[in-house]
Amino acid sequence: MRSNTEPNTPTTLAGLVLLSGLLGALVSGAALGEPIEKKGTTPYVTHFIFRPLMSMEIAGLGTATNLEAVGTTQNKKGEKMLDKMSAHCAALSVASGDKKYIDGACVLTDSDGDKIFSTFDTREVDKSQPDMSCGTHIITGGTGKYAGITGTEPFACNSLPALAGEGGYTSMDIPHNTSWEIKK
């Protein structure tokens, strides 16, 4: 006959399962920390590496290049919003005569897997922010905690030194001044 003090009794095992579930819930709640604000203005920078995927060129007329950009974000105020997110963008770079622009779309993903989607255009510049003279992102939506998010993100383009190796990879820091609102 077993005593109730043995570690493999049904009562002890059930207690351990309940305790581990309770501890998991407490740790998860603590890890989530403060909730995300519903509205705000956030300065952040994305550290990007650009990879050319395909290019068309007609000498003397112009080029069009498909680019993939990957990187991470850093909130400049040390806040949770738009900090430590992975960034993945698809872009089209066009240069023809006096026209030079890059259009595209980006997805920012946080550690929970929640996403923010935006489009961008380097021809749309917010003249009220002269330091952000490279273009503007338009936040069109999100998933999870970012569901219902909209906003604008004027941005600058700060080129970094050339990357080593082949493939035409380039890098850039892109600071943003983001005004956003989550309407759920």
Where are these regions (language model features)?
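Residues at structural and domain junctions
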Residues: 18-19, 99
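Hydrophobic transmembrane signal anchors and adjacent membrane-proximal interface regions, especially
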Residues: 17-18, 180
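Beta-strand-enriched cores of mature, soluble protein domains
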Residues: 32-184
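Bacterial N-terminal signal peptides that target proteins for export
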Residues: 2-17
